[in-house]
Amino acid sequence: MPKTEETVLQNDPSVAENGAPEPKTPGQSQKSKSFCLDDQSPDLIETVNEVSKLSISHEIVVNQDFYVEETILPPNSVEGRFAEAMYNAFWNHLKEQLLSTPPDFTCALELLKDVKETLLSLLLPWQNRLRNEIEEALDTDLLKQEAEHGALDVPHLSNYILNLMALLCAPVRDEAIQKLETIRDPVQLLRGILRVLGLMKMDMVNYTIQSFRPYLQEHSIQYEQAKFQELLDKQPSLLDYTTKWLTKAATDITTLCPSSPDSPSSSCSMVCSLPSGAGNNSEPPSPTMVLYQGYLNLLLWDLENVEFPETLLMDRIRLQELAFQLHQLTVLASVLLVARSFSGEVLFRSPEFVDRLKCTTKALTEEFISRPEETMLSVSEQVSQEVHQGLKDMGLTTLSSENTASLLGQLQNITKKENCIRSIVDQWIRFFLKCCLLHGMQESLLHFPGGLILIEKELAELGWKFLNLMHHNQQVFGPYYAEILKHIIHPAQAQETDVEPN
């Protein structure tokens, strides 16, 4: 039996990057084959199912763009060619059965059974009359009897199914169903029906997600806490990595000094507003400050380190994406600061010029992490040309050969991690994110670091994503963090006793 077009979760990392699940080597296939859930204990299967439910619920709540979409395998890929060959083989077999004398309806009956189940799954709870009608018109036993007597009218049933689909489908599928109505070949028609029904099931899933999202958001904290507690009861060591993560955060925060680069002088107004223990290492850190330091450390996480905190595993991909965006913003802001120092304020007062320069730099720095030297060579040349043309268009004095060479050199030096400008920008950005956690976005924007004003929009967007994600995590796992931190920070020394979000 062929399956209808499969769907996948949009944020499945194995699909999001390549458009299809990553192919496995023969060794990997054998290994994955040996680990079959059917061969595992019921407890393990139950745990996997619970984790899956928790992950999907969490995804719906924290990702407003979450939806299910159709998987389209690349036509020239091994998977694509294999799937197409298997589908064609089945439909050719169905055609042979229907054309045989007398006709063989074995496969057709199985297809009609699948169609019936799919149609019933698309009905809403109160559509009982339509449910009874489908049950009667596509009664499996009755169809089987008709097939045995050679009286199964496949074209008539297909037209009936098309009418039902037109009644039940979302407007976006009207055109697809109209095209099906023009198909006269019964095999091609059934094939088209199965495909569009698969899309309609996907539409129903997305409609359900959209409808239930407000309810899930209202009850997500309690639900995630309850599910995690169930998992913790079965596996008491489930917080081991979380404990290590918070222990490191406590160590990091006690070694910071208020005069260190982590508190840029240009943001002194924000330092003054930090709670006790936030910027003075002579006092013990508060549990909340330790937790926020831990959150910030996630943006520096080594991808090779498998000891990722269990309480944040569901957000690991999102945090990696935020870390990449942070890195890209650091490079972007560094480039803009260097370019402005050479071209002057007048040119950078032009929103059109700044937007054009930002767009160019963003596009060229996509591969900065993997090819830093080559990337910055391209960036330096392009930025130099943009600055030269911008000054010329505004009737300003263009850069001399000496200044142009210096501009190129300073831009290319951004490649180095120890580059002064890049280091300062990185510290400003992280300090801004820390203040977002402590004081919220609105207050943090009032004290926005002047050196980052050219990326205020992009950084504010990053800050919102990071703040909302960590706020939800703190609401769910705050009680667990508080319990762990009691053993890391002595209660008599701690500045506070809980880690509830502000």
Curated annotation (Swiss-Prot):
State the family named in the UniProt similarity comment for this chain: Belongs to the TCP11 family.
Its Gene Ontology cellular component terms are: acrosomal vesicle; sperm flagellum
Annotated region (Disordered) at 1-36
One Pfam assignment? Tcp11
Xref: PANTHER family: T-COMPLEX PROTEIN 11 X-LINKED PROTEIN 1-RELATED (PTHR12832:SF21), TESTIS-SPECIFIC PROTEIN PBS13 T-COMPLEX 11 (PTHR12832)
Q: What is this protein called?
A: T-complex protein 11-like X-linked protein 1
Q: Identify the gene encoding this protein.
A: TCP11X1
Report the record's Gene Ontology biological process terms. Answer: protein kinase A signaling; regulation of sperm capacitation
